């Protein structure tokens, strides 16, 4: 087997290995366990009490009938829902701009739900103290409010006074998108010092994990000490708790494929933070939380601290905006752009840019593909010339094979010397394929993880570019009244991709070696079955790329 065949097979094996590995067996680098700082016993006991105060709501929550709980209604162009005045909990949130599915009567996406529901999911910001004698607002506190509706135009002010006359004021604002700002103010009208700590938590009873879990992160996530921390639900379930000592916490939260809930603490200090798992009475719950250092409020003094909650869709431009506006490090990494981040995000920007002009992400994919093809034209031309030279050298290569058939080392040496003499790169024919692999996966990632591609329509029967082609040849594209099993869902776009790939091969120089030629003939069929379950937007890209390659090959053949 000559070097040309070896290079081809190596490229094919590499490509297939990466594709299958990416979809099924991607293993993220093991997260290094944070070193815990050594403290005195008193501080350790204090921290233990603080963490207990945070974790307990995750494992033992008192359920009250929702009809008995007073609420502040949330109303903006992006959100609707309410905040419970009992415990000041964000536990009712609906995303108005997104539907559950493409059906006509589909309901809006529900993000947060109260504790007595099947999909309990909520966030809260509050205060704790290491002294039991300090009376603070807790989960049973009923707050008073100066308004009934929270909107971007109208913040709400909440207040509560304890038996010592200490006033607790909370001002909540919401922007037109998905960001809440919570400013807590404590007015110490008592004659005692108050040791106060601010905390925030997000608690979730159920996990909405996509089937292709290995190709994107879902679960606890955050930016701690300017490093991205990602733990799957299984990771936290195995560990029970992942603790981070006093650190710079830009944000922590829980992420789904398209949705994110995140706590963004005040930047005035460092925080201890935790990713927790607990199970009680058969109910599993996950929680992320942070807690601030102790702040002593002297008699007659005031203290204020501001935190934020993000709860909504992971729109790229929106996360970028918040990251810049509030200096939230790595906030855009809540979207899992993957290994090729430096390519994937620019690819998205390019698609989104053209979408702004054409109003269709499918057309935007076609335009971006043309640009990528033009950028790679020189490489493709060099590849063609190299393949031509190798084909012309085949008689000489066969002569060398016959001459040194009993000496493999000398055979390889002579062939490489021939390549060097004729200035031929034996792997040049594989370069266009290898270069396209990062581009391919970048487009795949953009289609799979960005909310902008969710339910984005093309033309005809394509109603969601991020989903597989819904048609199949085995029921004549819907003419026959039955649905084949999923592995037979080979639609029109996968077939078009295979046909254009076959035609592209016909336009390219045919390998001189018969074995190599046979391998290439089967590639369209292999790719037909392999890509049929991929997002149809990716198949549109690949088919269009093949058509452009055919045009390009015609040009090269004519002028070379």
Curated annotation (Swiss-Prot):
Q: How does it sit in the membrane?
A: Multi-pass membrane protein
**GO BP field:** protein insertion into membrane; protein transport
Please verify whether the record's keywords include Mitochondrion. no
Q: What function is annotated for this protein?
A: Required for the insertion and/or proper folding and/or complex formation of integral membrane proteins into the membrane. Involved in integration of membrane proteins that insert both dependently and independently of the Sec translocase complex, as well as at least some lipoproteins. Aids folding of multispanning membrane proteins.
Offer an example of a GO molecular function term for this protein: membrane insertase activity
Q: Which domain of life is it from?
A: Bacteria
Which parts of the chain span the membrane according to its record? 5-25, 334-354, 357-377, 431-451, 476-496, 522-542
**What protein family does this chain belong to?**
Belongs to the OXA1/ALB3/YidC family. Type 1 subfamily.
Gene3D superfamilies according to UniProt: 2.70.98.90
User: What are the alphabetically sorted keywords of the record?
Assistant: Cell inner membrane, Cell membrane, Chaperone, Membrane, Protein transport, Transmembrane, Transmembrane helix, Transport
Q: What is this protein called?
A: Membrane protein insertase YidC
Quaternary structure and partners: Interacts with the Sec translocase complex via SecD. Specifically interacts with transmembrane segments of nascent integral membrane proteins during membrane integration.
Q: Where in the cell is it found?
A: Cell inner membrane
Q: InterPro entries of this UniProt entry? A: Membr_insert_YidC, Membr_insert_YidC_N, YidC/ALB3/OXA1/COX18, YidC/Oxa/ALB_C, YidC_ALB_C, YidC_periplasmic_sf
GO cellular component annotations of the record: plasma membrane
